[in-house]
Amino acid sequence: MNLKTHAFNDRGRIPSRYTCDGENISPPLSWDGVPGEAKSLALICDDPDAPSKVWTHWVIFNIPPDSTGLEENVPDAGRLPDGSVQGYNDSGTLGYRGPCPPSGVHRYFFRLYALDTVLDLEPGASKEDVLEAMEGHVLGEAKLIGLYRRG
């Protein structure tokens, strides 16, 4: 599987538009190579360089397996029209919250998972809930890393 965005290169700088210094909207993402037997997709974005813990910026799951991406500025709703479900980020809100590092360059990992099941979770599920429900059901994975430093 492959995960990419036209907004920045893998390991490139995330434009401020997608951060707390800009519009704080989700970047457009696209993918291909999803296994044919996939029943759903899940996407998690987090920052392993946060000072106190890995900081979760986005949790979205039960994405239809035949989808090829997410448009820019996914609404902050629990359930989306295509059936996708969003969980809480570590800011305590549904949907995407962009990079806002306190200091230095941080890495933001966008991970896409192809699953052999649809997750039986409600809107507002945590990253930990999603990872636990995914256990033993991952058919494939793709990763995209963006970098951001304030100022």
Swiss-Prot record:
**What InterPro entries does the database record attribute to this sequence?**
PEBP (IPR008914), PEBP-like_sf (IPR036610), YbhB_YbcL/LppC-like (IPR005247)
Q: Which residues cross the membrane?
A: none
What SUPFAM superfamilies does the entry give?
PEBP-like
Segments forming a coiled coil: none
Q: Which CDD domains match?
A: PEBP_bact_arch (cd00865)
An example of a Pfam family matching this protein is PBP
Note the NCBIfam families from the entry: YbhB/YbcL family Raf kinase inhibitor-like protein (TIGR00481)
Family membership noted in the UniProt record = Belongs to the UPF0098 family.
User: Can you name this protein?
Assistant: UPF0098 protein MTH_273
Tell me what organism the protein belongs to: Methanothermobacter thermautotrophicus (strain ATCC 29096 / DSM 1053 / JCM 10044 / NBRC 100330 / Delta H) (Methanobacterium thermoautotrophicum)
Q: What is the lineage of its organism?
A: Archaea, Methanobacteriati, Methanobacteriota, Methanomada group, Methanobacteria
